Design a protein with these regions (language model features):
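A structural preference for short, pocket-lining loop segments at secondary-structure junctions
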Residues: 1-22
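Conserved catalytic cores of soluble enzyme domains
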Residues: 15-151, 155, 163
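Intrinsically disordered, low-complexity segments enriched in small/flexible residues
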Residues: 144, 148-184
Length: 184
């Protein structure tokens, strides 16, 4: 982040993590403090920022990379402070209700878009992007068409961010992240 600020380069964060360890050693090692510092740095960074939620985003480490000017998500990406399995285990004392818990948490990319956490969803599969197409590839995230759509989308978003006035962009970023979690 410091280098992006010093050189005036945009910063792209990519979130695809199962999350940090939820144990005593992680807490004693200062994980919570590092997450807090990262959140503060991301919100105040003068450089244009773009976050890509590429796969799973679980825990504070994923949330720490989220406060960007714009947030994009792959169609099948999700974000949660606690994985649905963990939340299900806490709420119901079983992980068998993880799907129901995920639905209630609103962790899917479409839910995140509806709540203003994600700005844009990039379709992963050709049939999702064009309304038709071949069967699901074995590794949809490695599909050339998806990568082309993703690259074009990232390029367009970064160009738009770089064209914005810095003070206006920073004010909008701060306002955006103050609203997250508020009703209406």
């Amino acid at each position: 982040m410091r280098i992006a600020a010093e050189l005036g380069l945009p910063l792209l964060t990519v979130v695809d993590t199962a999350g940090a360890a939820l144990n005593r050693e992680a807490e004693e090692g200062g994980l919570a403090g590092e997450i807090a510092r990262c959140l503060a740095d991301m919100v105040t960074l003068p450089a244009p920022t773009l976050c890509l939620l590429l796969g799973q985003g679980a825990g504070g480490a994923a949330l720490a990379l989220l406060p960007a000017d714009r947030v994009l998500a792959a169609r099948h990406a999700w974000l949660s402070p606690l994985p649905p399995e963990g939340a299900s285990a806490i709420l119901y004392r079983t992980t068998e209700r993880a799907y129901e818990t995920a639905d209630r948490q609103g962790v899917r990319s479409a839910d995140l878009l509806a709540h203003g956490i994600v700005d844009r969803i990039v379709e992963e599969e050709p049939q999702d992007a064009a309304g038709e197409g071949p069967e699901r590839p074995e590794h949809p995230s490695r599909d050339d068409a998806f990568l082309a759509r993703l690259g074009a989308t990232l390029g367009a978003e970064l160009a738009a961010l770089r064209a914005q006035d810095q003070a206006e962009r920073l004010a909008a970023r701060r306002a955006r992240h103050r609203r997250i979690g508020l009703p209406g």
